[in-house]
């Protein structure tokens, strides 16, 4: 998708792992597979939409019991923290830390500053994709995609993929392009 290689393996609808160019060791316990740029179809390319209208990955959501610990682990792996915020937009107070991995954003979420931290293992919590035309993608996917609504990012819209109907356990959202 765009400049990001997506290789599906295994069965059972579980998200089993990821690879980041230049990273070979686990990040705060989060397994990382070796990035294989010799695999057919791994040459970066322009945003060519799939027939469902998806053109690239927008961001990967990583959940941690301790944002400071996990952000430091990402920094040690060579990824730069590019911003962050505290929010209650999703209910309980939480912290979001944003990092870039190539052209994909990593959104690290966990307890807000001053909230108790935990030893909860770091995990992939969600995936957000970009559709060239969100309404067309929603039409193509029919009842498999929720109704598009305003996203947190100004000028963008978002809709959730109905994972149970699709057969996946990882929360997936589809977003309109950046404006």
Could you describe each region identified by the protein language model?
Residues 1-82, 93, 100-179:
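Glyoxalase I/VOC metalloenzyme domain signal
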